[in-house]
């Protein structure tokens, strides 16, 4: 028989995230007007500080040198499953799309200068990133179909394409 249980260290972090979501995040989320963007943003900002400073739950996917928890794929799956039970959960842990993927991209391929300019503020929760995928000529959400491209023209970059 196959044992599908998590190793103790992963189960510990999974349960910690569950407790945090159940005792802190969900009550806050349910107490606000979820259609009022200013309340939603203020709640996320406030809970991010609690997650990071009081619970040690911050950037579960990133290395410690960037303030993260250095969790591997299995632990990230467990954390994501628990955080996703409250719609703002991934935002509170600074592990939401597209920032999580963009943090990985910057971590592995950015220059040191780019990391300081773009990755550090993302990891500190001071900025957000975006991904302009949709185009009028291409239906769907498959980024491999993106037609827009950039090319260097002297000292400048030219973006050629259409976005909605």
Protein language model annotation of sequence segments:
Residues 77, 104, 148:
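Active-site phosphate/pyrophosphate- and oxyanion-stabilizing loops and adjacent acidic/basic residues
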Residues 41-44, 71, 103-104, 140-143:
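Short, solvent-exposed polar/charged micro-motifs at secondary-structure junctions
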Residues 91-113, 142:
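N-terminal glycine-rich flavin-associated loop
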């Amino acid at each position: 028989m196959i044992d599908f249980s998590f190793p103790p260290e992963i189960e510990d972090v999974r349960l910690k995230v569950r407790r945090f979501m159940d005792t802190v995040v969900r009550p806050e989320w349910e107490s606000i007007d979820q259609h009022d963007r200013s309340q939603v943003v203020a709640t996320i900002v406030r809970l991010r500080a609690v997650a990071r400073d009081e619970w040690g739950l911050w950037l579960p996917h990133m290395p410690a040198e960037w303030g993260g928890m250095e969790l591997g794929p299995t632990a990230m799956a467990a954390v994501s499953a628990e955080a996703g039970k409250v719609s703002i959960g991934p935002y509170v842990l600074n592990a939401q799309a597209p920032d999580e993927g963009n943090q990985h991209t910057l971590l592995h391929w950015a220059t040191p200068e780019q990391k300081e300019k773009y990755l550090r503020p993302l990891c500190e929760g001071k900025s957000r990133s975006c991904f302009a995928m949709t185009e009028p000529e291409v239906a769907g959400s498959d980024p491999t179909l993106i037609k827009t491209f950039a090319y260097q023209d002297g000292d400048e970059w030219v973006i050629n394409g259409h976005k909605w």
